[in-house]
Amino acid sequence: MEQIPKNRIGYIDALRGMAMILVVYFHIAAYGFGSYEIGYNDIIERFRMPTFFFISGWLFYKAGRIWDRQTITGMIRKKFMVQIIPTVVFMLLYLVMFNLLDVTSFGSDKKGYWFTVVLFEYFVIYILAEALLNRRDSATGEIHVFVIMLLLSIAAFYYAKYYTRYAAELGTWKDILGFLSFVKIRHIIFFWFGTFVRKHFDRFIYLTDNRYVTAVLIGLFAAIIVWPTVLSVNGIEYIAYLIAGLSGTIICFTYFRTHQEYFSRNTWYGRGLQLIGRRTLDIYLIHYFVLPYNLVQPEVWLQYHHNTLFVPIALILAFWVILISLLISSLFRVSPLLAKYLFGAK
């Protein structure tokens, strides 16, 4: 039986599990049915990745940590072993098996394997920002770090928007920024927000326990969904993106926190979500190998599809893909050596 560390927080693992299910659900729609929007994915995408990165930041923050040279190098080395080495191994295997090995595979999306690479970049950026701008852990230093994260997020957001217009003028920089998955840096603000919430968690709980605050957050998220044309107005697209991401993430986090008894190990679905949450890296790395690709011709499905009908179909497929991924992960983890280099296990 798997030994679960006592310091793990059940509802956090369950929330990660839900986020992982939504990622696989999205990939079922994208790779299996040829659409990024069916099955309400156009709504889910507003908070799916923001929630994932928020949790990553929340878990990464540690009160009292001093970013001296030894801590910085040790942490970056540790994250490199966990995030980059397994990703390189699985990505190369995937590219070879599916005959996709060419230079374009190492662009911003990396055939789907961008998440762990970008998360490593977030760790490095955050660590360096804290070490250089907030060594005394002051309010001023905290603001400086926030400004850096916000500017990076805005720059990446608008780079993605205007990429096709200016790509030809970037020359070599286009390839460098693609290799670094710079367009994905737009989510770094949610990673920072996770660290900020963890640092000020008591205040966060006090605010989100207020029914009026949660009502406003739900209203903001709903407004952006109901009036999507707001997103197309020049100059405020980023504000809408930020509000949707933050409100959606806070709503999800608060729901799991305030209903944590339902997501504990005392319930069957709580145990299931926590298991998925503890194995998000394994599932992420493996699931591309077992996704059902090209289930139907995209134009056929898009012509006759129905969102409500699609949801149970895609969820069943998503759970099946996750189950197979967990079984494969369990086989690999029999070997401590493979567990270390394939999944960053200690």
Please give the residue ranges for each predicted region.
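Alpha-helical transmembrane segments and their immediate juxtamembrane cytosolic regions
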Residues: 1-346
